[in-house]
Amino acid sequence: MANKIFLDTNIVVDFIIKREFELAATEQIFDSIHNNKLEAYISESVISTSIYLLRQYKIDTLAIFRDLCKFIHVAAFNRNVLFMPIEKFSDTEDGLLYFLANHNKMNYFITRNKKDFVYTVPSLSVLTPDEFIKTIFSPR
């Protein structure tokens, strides 16, 4: 069974605009998703926030997300997520996304800003793209 990963907004934006931060690892993650080696999820808010952040680049973000959603699942929020300890996060959106991923039994939460994730649960690791690639694809 493939590892289930949740992609934070910054990872999706980095991939779309080819931002240099850990770009090789980010591209390897998306290649693995496309080749069905990883089962990836985002949320509706990741899509809407990314579209908002990418408006300055004058690219067809709707077409990009239509394509991405052919191989990336969209996890829906439900009220159970709202009752999780989101207030432990300094960034409410990060808390919502993290607990959405946890509620949907993800194995890994991939983000560029690990510092915002001071409260985590043992069943859901928070990793940068490089850390994830080293953890999953490095020989043991």
PLM-predicted stretches and their roles:
Residues 27-88, 95, 99, 122:
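PIN-domain endoribonuclease scaffold, especially VapC-family toxins
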Residues 89-91, 140:
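Short, surface-exposed amphipathic charged segments that create phosphate/polyanion-binding patches used
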Residues 11, 46, 81, 97, ...:
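Alpha-helix capping/helix-boundary segments
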Residues 1-40, 56-60, 127, 134-140:
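Short, well-structured N-terminal submotif of metal-dependent ribonuclease cores
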Residues 11, 50, 100, 107-111:
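Short, hydrophobic/aromatic-rich beta-strand segments within well-structured domains
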Residues 14-16, 49, 119:
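A short acidic, helix-capping loop that chelates divalent metal ions and anchors anionic groups
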Residues 8, 94, 113:
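Acidic active-site catalytic centers that drive phospho-/nucleotidyl reactions
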Residues 2, 103-140:
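Acidic, PIN/NYN-like endoribonuclease modules and their adjacent C-terminal/linker elements
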